[in-house]
Amino acid sequence: MTYRKEIELVFDASSFLSSNANAAARQPVNFRLDLWYIGANRELNPLPLTAEKEFFLQSIRDHIRGLPQAQTQVKDLLSAVSVSWNKASAVVDDIRLLNVSCPTGITKTSDNSILVKSNLLIAPLTTKIEISFHLTSQSGENGIEVGISPSAAVVYGERFNEPKMGEFLLNRCGDAVEEKGHSTKVSWGNAVAELGEKLLARGRK
């Protein structure tokens, strides 16, 4: 089964709970299931497997492999995968837009976390700010939950208040990744651009 022509889920439907079955009567046996990225191989508009996609892919795979199949309905499995991948798509968009204006890199920091670093240059003030978004995943009730911990540090130039910059980013971006199309916060790129404008105005005073 594929989703968004980007990922493919392979599983044995017979090992999962049917809508009219008794969970208590099922044998608690988990059959192997797999989740692969297929977006790079499609003919129309192929999309490479990036570091952030790999992070989400592994996190989702670990989550669904931990589900008790005999007590889980297929619709709940599919929902967990789709909701989680929608969050991945939101992060992919955020990083892509952020990278348009600020050089951005991604580092894997553990099996369930990555660090997104971006450089904000404020040329009129000869100032460089390193922006970081630390993402950490864990299993939730419906797929994975991914926390966001933003921070900012002055590399050189004006000595702006680093905790306040981090607080600004947290307020604008939130502390958790939301599904693509359902976000209540601004994009990372817009938040960083707003921060740059505020710092420029403050530095000129």
Task: Name what the model sees in each region.
Residues 8-10, 17-20:
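Eukaryotic short linear interaction motifs
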Residues 1, 18-205:
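Glycine-centered motif in EGF-like
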Residues 3, 11-13:
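Extended alpha-helical solenoid/rod scaffold regions
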